[in-house]
């Protein structure tokens, strides 16, 4: 049995889970998420828990068993508590500001990068004197949050020599030694 898939998902107070025609719908105080699943797995709601089971024991079905259990668990956690990612802008003159859902990034290019953020993601920029600017993203949808954060990081990935670029807070960069004289 899948080590991840066999664990039931506890449903916290204030969260409802519905299963209809291979679609799981999770509703909570922060929002609503839906997920389709294949007929290789079955999803049941019993006694305040979500149980994911698989029909057979092939390699693909074992993988999907753990996958759908993890996706549903992320949905339940997202609508109850939410997820947060913080990006740090490391570099001279790197700045971030926001006007509503528009993120304005100055990352050393000739023009600023203006990015429209999805309405499901809340955006906050923190700029303190003497510290690197931080972009804080919060959402109930973990997949969308990771996609938006990866897109922002992709504008200027951290380089290995000086560490300049956009990185996640707490991310450890593999640094290289410069050329020796």
Swiss-Prot record:
Gene3D superfamilies, per database record: Ribosomal protein L6, alpha-beta domain (3.90.930.12)
Record-linked Pfam families: Ribosomal_L6
GO molecular function, one term: rRNA binding
This protein's GO CC annotations: cytosolic large ribosomal subunit
Record-level GO BP terms: cytoplasmic translation
SUPFAM superfamilies recorded: Ribosomal protein L6
Protein keywords: Ribonucleoprotein, Ribosomal protein, RNA-binding, rRNA-binding
Origin: domain of life: Bacteria
Function: This protein binds to the 23S rRNA, and is important in its secondary structure. It is located near the subunit interface in the base of the L7/L12 stalk, and near the tRNA binding site of the peptidyltransferase center.
Family the UniProt entry places it in: Belongs to the universal ribosomal protein uL6 family.
PANTHER family in the cross-refs: 60S/50S RIBOSOMAL PROTEIN L6/L9, LARGE RIBOSOMAL SUBUNIT PROTEIN UL6M
NCBIfam families linked: L6_bact
Protein name (Swiss-Prot/TrEMBL): Large ribosomal subunit protein uL6
Species name: Flavobacterium psychrophilum (strain ATCC 49511 / DSM 21280 / CIP 103535 / JIP02/86)
Gene name for this UniProt entry: rplF
């Amino acid at each position: 049995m899948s080590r991840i898939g066999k664990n039931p998902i506890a449903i916290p107070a204030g969260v409802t889970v519905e299963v209809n025609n291979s679609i799981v719908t999770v509703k909570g105080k922060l929002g609503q998420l839906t997920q389709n699943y294949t007929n290789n797995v079955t999803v049941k709601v019993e006694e305040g828990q979500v149980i994911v089971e698989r029909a057979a024991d092939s390699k693909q079905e074992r993988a999907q068993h753990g996958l759908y259990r993890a996706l549903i668990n992320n949905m339940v956690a997202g609508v109850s508590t939410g997820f947060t990612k913080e990006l740090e802008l490391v570099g001279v003159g790197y700045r971030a500001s926001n006007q509503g859902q528009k993120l304005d990034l100055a990352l050393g290019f000739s023009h600023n990068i203006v990015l429209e953020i999805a309405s499901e993601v809340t955006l906050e920029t923190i700029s303190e004197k003497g510290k690197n600017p931080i972009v804080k993203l919060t959402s109930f949808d973990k997949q969308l949050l990771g996609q938006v954060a990866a897109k922002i990081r992709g504008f200027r990935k951290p380089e290995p020599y000086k560490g300049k670029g956009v990185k996640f807070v707490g991310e450890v960069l593999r640094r290289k030694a410069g050329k020796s004289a």
